[in-house]
Amino acid sequence: TKGKGSDNIKKLREYLSKSNELEPNVKNWASNIYDDYHSFQKGVDISKKYDPEFVSTNFNSQNLSELIKTRRSVRYFKKQSIDESILKEIFDVVNWAPNSCNRQAIKLFVKSNSSEEIKELMKLNNGATCMNVPPVFVSICFDTKGLVLPIEREVAYIDSGLGLQNLILMAHSKGIATCVLNWTHAKQSQEDSLRKKLNIDKYHLIIANMVMGYPSKGSPIPTRSNLKDFVIWR
């Protein structure tokens, strides 16, 4: 409705101009909303921007199913390093996963091509890592500055899980294996050490760690539940 929300939009603009904690992409996104609001108030037709056509794809679903079903958690890696350009291409898909309020709050802290440092990082996972030293160690974190209510903490785990799956599948498509390392058992001393080694700020919630590299061997194919065991039709 024309004129509706004008007071709130002014407050939003003031907040955006003063806030230094927002990520640039989030700040730009919110600023664009503000600009579109004023364009609408001036009579500009913005319907195409906010009511776009559904984007379809000709991607072969069988190929996608094969990619998903052939992925394995791998714990044996070659010493071969991963080119930085390939890593960037893999990491780029993380924030294309669904995420709450378009926060795009996942942060990846990456250590690569430093076997001694990676070995020390893996020790923080109490040995639940891999059988040799991989070329890349990643700590998956979530920027909590954008979370307001205590219940929103769960959002961090949901968003990070969705984004991490994107990363894992993209890596698999390039012949790079991964293994997600559980962090729920970490002691406070281990968390403090990880934060210090990777310079992770206190407002970045550590969700999980992951190792990745070119596999030197595969992993057994685990038995999967039948569809009827986990899909309940109502």
Task: Give residue spans per PLM region.
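Acidic, surface-exposed loops and disordered segments
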Residues: 1-234
